[in-house]
Amino acid sequence: MRAIISLLLISAMVFSMIEAVPVEEGLQLFEGERGGCLPRNKFCNPSSGPRCCSGLTCKELNIWASKCL
């Protein structure tokens, strides 16, 4: 009986964490994959992947990171 109650509580906690991210925010996270552009100070890939919005270029900050500036 305790195992069933524990499983139900864990399931409820996981569900509440999943619902914590609004649908609109989730869609914004994947805007680059849909062909949208990246705004200022967002990470980009100069050789491939999502492109920066007009007027911005993908600048390499260091070996591991590039941002739209």
From Swiss-Prot:
One of its GO terms (molecular function) is toxin activity. Keywords: Disulfide bond, Knottin, Neurotoxin, Secreted, Signal, Toxin. Disulfide bonds join C37-C53, C44-C58, C52-C68. GO terms for cellular component: extracellular region. Its main location: secreted. The keyword Disulfide bond applies. The keyword Heme does not apply. Residues 21-34 form a propeptide. It comes from the Eukaryota. Residues 1-20 form the signal peptide. Expressed by the venom gland. It is found in: Secreted. Insect active toxin causing rapid but reversible paralysis in crickets. No activity shown in mammals. Does not show effect on mammalian voltage-gated calcium channels. The presence of a 'disulfide through disulfide knot' structurally defines this protein as a knottin. Belongs to the neurotoxin 01 (U2-agtx) family. This is U2-agatoxin-Ao1w. It comes from Agelena orientalis.
